[in-house]
């Protein structure tokens, strides 16, 4: 069976960098072996099993579609349980595509998810129709609006990102919502064209 392995997780302040190794037959689905995420807060005290969540969220669907195994040293139990629901949904939507693969973690850890500095709800927010509809459905919980650079707006498109984040902040000012920006090389980590034709 093919394998995708999270080899390392390195944290420096607000940035997490992951090195991912994969079987030769899976190379066509990856543009690089390094996945990185930068937050607008320091994440150096976040437990390792929680830090693995962003990279696993990227590679697990690839594993399911290619009947591969993802290996990782540590992962958060709450994420693993939520991931099962994501997989079930994808299998119902695409039964021919998602029919194998899995996650093999050395340790699945129950972390204390006690509320800390942030004690509210959050939602991904681009300012598009879907994110506006999500906000309208959940506005009573006053979600923080999280925008991600690296999917629609590339990580190197600084001016375009400033404009996009400006629109998010304008909306947030009208609704008195907090905002957060995340930068991740989502669109340059995986080869989405190859995944779409798989």
Put a short name on every predicted segment.
Residues 77, 129-131:
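Gly/Ser/Thr-rich loops at beta-strand to alpha-helix junctions
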Residues 134:
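Hydrophobic positions on the alpha1 helix immediately C-terminal to the Walker A/P-loop
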Residues 181-198:
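Conserved adenosine/adenylate-binding substructure
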Residues 131, 152-155, 187-190:
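Flexible loop/turn segments at secondary-structure boundaries
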Residues 122-129:
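Short, glycine-rich nucleotide/cofactor-binding loops
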Residues 1-119, 137-183:
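RNA-binding accessory domains that recognize and position tRNA/RNA substrates
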């Amino acid at each position: 069976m093919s394998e995708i392995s999270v080899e390392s997780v390195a944290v420096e302040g607000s940035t997490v960098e992951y090195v991912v190794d994969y079987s030769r037959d899976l190379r066509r689905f990856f543009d690089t072996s390094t996945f990185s995420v930068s937050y607008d807060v320091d994440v150096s005290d976040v437990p390792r099993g929680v830090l693995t969540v962003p990279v696993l969220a990227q590679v697990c669907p690839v594993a399911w579609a290619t009947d591969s195994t993802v290996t990782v040293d540590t992962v958060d139990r709450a994420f693993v349980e939520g991931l099962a629901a994501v997989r079930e949904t994808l299998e119902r939507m695409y039964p021919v595509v998602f029919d194998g693969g899995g996650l093999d973690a050395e340790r699945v850890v129950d972390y204390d998810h006690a509320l800390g500095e942030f004690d509210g709800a959050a939602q991904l927010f681009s300012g598009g129709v879907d994110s506006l509809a999500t906000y309208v459905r959940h506005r009573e919980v006053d979600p923080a609006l999280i925008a991600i650079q690296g999917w629609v707006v590339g990580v190197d498109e600084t001016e375009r990102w400033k404009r996009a984040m400006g629109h998010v902040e304008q909306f947030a000012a009208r609704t008195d919502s907090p905002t957060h920006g995340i930068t991740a090389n989502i669109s340059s980590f995986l080869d989405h064209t190859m995944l779409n034709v798989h």
